[in-house]
Amino acid sequence: MDLEGLIRQVKHNCTISDARFWGYYSVCGLLMRMRELYLNEHSLMPWDNAPADAVSRWLSGREAQWGVLEDERLHEIEVGGRLYDPFDADALNLLLRGSKLVYGSGYAMFNKPTFFVGELIESRELLDYRVCFTGHELCRDLSAYAAMLQGRCIYVRHDVIKAIIFDRFQTMRARRYGGVAEEMFRYYGIRKTDVLSHDLIGSFGDMAAAIAEIFVRHEVGEAYEDDGSEEWAEVLLSCNDKHSELYLRGVKDLIADTSNMGPLRAITAAGDRPLLYAYMALLDGLRKELFPMIGNAFQRFVETGEWVAIEGARERGYEKAKGWRESVLRLWNDGGIHAVKKYLVETFSQRPRSSA
């Protein structure tokens, strides 16, 4: 099998997707993603130095390439004279068996097609799902999620998680008081005063392997909380503005997080303090806005060590998010997307603070 040819085709589809959807991102969000993509394509990690002049030349070349490809359709993947739908991850992964590679595909924010090929470092069974953990990624697009669910497989991307961890580390070091992030890192043997070293980078990897469970359980929660999933997908497809889509996805994420099958329930059941601190440190922007009760509950937990506060907040958050989902689906059936958007504006008065 021509692995280089397959990777080249996937990379081309990644670039087509980026060419068609880069304009949906904020300026800051786009620049951040472009830097991450540059690092990936040059086999660099977030803590590696990227020469400014080289990055600038790459950016110019990529923008020119986007101009050529912005109207091009995604290509089928040709392997051994046969064509495969780029979203048929199951079929393509059957071809990759024995290669120690894994292929992932799906849809990201703004219904953007997203693809990657990564080195398979581990796989295991969890409930009814196969969980694939990837290391170095040979190709990817601008959208890179820590985990994604495709069919009966959950893909967990260690490089993406390590990038998230390093970003939190940098943010913590820039602040006078590290807060919950400092406590999270302390659980994994990382101090605010640590300087970049081989040992510290190794600790980032160990930490990524540990907190990957949060992302795995989120995807499991999403899979099991599939009531009205087809209708919800129709709502998202009909939604054509960032504000509404962010809240719709935020509601779905909150249901997954607070589900009986989600990460918070698993954390409380195991009494896993390090993972709880990690969950809180990774909670930001819109997710905090939709789930304010977890902040008060966490403070009580810090003071008393009693898990009942976290479990109570999880249950209340779940019921709240389920109510929002039911209202959205009812309005979708009764009044269409305009009724849904009106409801979202009235229910969530503050615009999201996250930059897509």
Task: Annotate the PLM regions.
Residues M1-D128, D199, R353-A356:
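N-terminal low-structure segments adjacent to metalloprotease catalytic domains
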Residues P51-A54, S60, M261-S354:
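Long, well-structured alpha-helical subdomains associated
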Residues G118-A144, V195-S197:
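Short linear interaction motifs
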Residues D141-A208:
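Active-site scaffold of zinc-dependent metalloenzymes
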Residues G202-I214, K242-D253:
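Short, charged/polar micro-motifs that form catalytic or ligand-binding hotspots
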Residues A210-D227:
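Active-site recognition of the HExxH zinc-binding catalytic motif
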Residues A223-K252:
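Post-HEXXH active-site segment of zinc metalloproteases
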Residues R249-R265:
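An active-site-proximal "capping" alpha-helix that borders the catalytic cofactor pocket
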